[in-house]
């Protein structure tokens, strides 16, 4: 009788395990500290602009001039001791992609996918659109791969815990793209190239 009860218990336990979803017993993937995000805006009839990035949090830290230094970041072992710009997000390269030529702050940028890097300062910021869109961060940044550099002025903004990109001032064939993090917004104007 004990053997019978033991066998029934074993069969029921096995049946229960077989009914669990396949991932229930597998180790769970670790959630990254900076989640991936993206935003897309259409201009005109058929021009899509997509910014893909990862979203670090403020988490009580001083961001500008500290976590994100003003000027180029000092070199480290990943950059082979070469100073580098900020990756304009976290983890992988922040990218912008569009299917038609655009004017960025009045400067023509051909259709394509570009890595975005930034050089912050206390006054004006340099935004770099790099032909290298697949680097991990900015450690391997090479100025010779720049497609365009623009200078913009950041503005004070309400507190934003998680870094985000967005579009505002939509006018059919133009918009202002922006990075917003902590209490700062970094806008840059985009317009269809006619």
Identify the meaning behind each predicted range.
Residues 1-4:
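Positively charged n-region of N-terminal signal peptides that target proteins for export
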Residues 6-9, 114:
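Conserved short hydrophobic patches within well-ordered secondary structure
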């Amino acid at each position: 009788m004990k053997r019978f009860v033991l066998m029934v218990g074993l069969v029921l336990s096995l049946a229960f395990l077989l009914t669990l979803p396949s991932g229930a017993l597998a180790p769970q993937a670790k959630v990254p500290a900076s989640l991936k995000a993206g935003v897309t805006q259409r201009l005109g009839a058929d021009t899509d602009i997509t910014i893909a990035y990862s979203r670090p949090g403020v988490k009580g830290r001083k961001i500008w001039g500290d976590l994100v230094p003003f000027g180029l970041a000092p070199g480290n072992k990943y950059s082979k001791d070469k100073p580098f710009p900020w990756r304009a997000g976290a983890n992988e390269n922040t990218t912008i992609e569009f299917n038609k030529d655009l004017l960025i702050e009045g400067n023509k940028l051909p259709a394509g996918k570009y890595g975005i890097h930034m050089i912050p300062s206390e006054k004006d910021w340099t935004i770099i659109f790099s032909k290298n869109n697949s680097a991990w961060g900015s450690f391997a940044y090479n100025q010779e791969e720049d497609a365009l550099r623009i200078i913009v002025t950041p503005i004070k903004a309400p507190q934003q815990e998680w870094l985000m990109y967005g579009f505002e001032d939509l006018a059919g064939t133009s918009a202002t793209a922006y990075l917003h993090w902590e209490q700062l917004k970094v806008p840059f104007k985009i317009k269809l190239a006619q």
